[in-house]
Design a protein with these regions (language model features):
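Extracellular "spike/adhesin" assembly and maturation modules
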Residues: 1-37
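Extracellular and organelle-lumenal recognition/adhesion modules and their flexible linkers in secreted
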Residues: 32-220
Length: 220
């Protein structure tokens, strides 16, 4: 048996005997089946975040949040807070060529979040993406990675996930991923792994989801 050049699948040699043909074909079929399964829905290696490079903004490229509610930003992304006194502006920014922080990948865009006023009463400030179906990654370990920097050194309170079981479903489950993230004035990559709780025994209703949340500094 030989190995395919890209995926390393076992495949018949040019000199394989006819009597080994069925065995060789089955080995190749099993290898392909395993590879496709591993990158399929909810399987290891599948990135479920959509528009993670902030390249798509169908509703515009700059938004302001001045109410204690939420605002839709780049496609699939949303921002939530509980105090509209802390006015925030969200905008698509373009990297100067050669300055993107990811080695080997010259990204084009990033998102900027700017606070215009301070708030003494804001208790949460959350940058998030909702992934349809609470079954997504249930019972598996996932990795959440992102790049961030700030105008001045600051601390992000936490990264967390929420499993919402939909209308009429079980009570939502919140799981902390990490806390007290030191963000500096230089781009840094942050990467954290977390075990997503099983949904065994839960009741799942309509419009369930898994939420990935990056909690931002409040009162600033």
């Amino acid at each position: 048996m030989a190995l395919s050049p890209n995926y390393g699948w076992a495949e018949p040699d040019n000199s394989s005997l006819v009597k080994n043909g069925a065995q060789d074909i089955r080995a190749l079929g099993d290898a392909i089946d395993t590879s496709v399964w591993n990158v399929g829905y909810g399987q290891a290696g599948k990135n479920k975040i959509i528009n993670g490079d902030f390249g798509i903004w169908q509703r515009g490229t700059s938004f302001q949040l001045n109410l204690a509610s939420s605002v839709a930003l780049a496609d699939r992304w949303q921002y939530l807070c509980d105090d509209g006194a802390n006015i925030k502006t969200f905008s698509q920014q373009t990297f100067t060529p050669g300055t993107a922080p990811v080695a080997g990948y010259e990204g084009t865009y990033f998102m900027r979040i700017a606070s215009a006023t301070a708030s003494a009463t804001e208790t949460y400030s959350l940058f998030t993406q909702y992934i349809e179906n609470v079954r997504t990654f249930a019972g598996q370990t996932i990795t959440i990675s992102f790049w961030a920097k700030a105008a001045a050194n600051t601390t992000m309170p936490s990264v967390a996930i929420r499993q919402n079981f939909g209308s009429g479903g079980s009570t939502a489950v919140d799981t902390s991923v990490t806390t007290n993230i030191a963000v500096t004035t230089s781009w840094q990559r942050f990467s954290y792994s977390v075990a997503v709780p099983s949904v065994s025994g839960k009741t799942i209703g309509a419009n369930s989801y898994l939420r990935i949340g990056l909690f931002n500094p409040t009162q600033a």
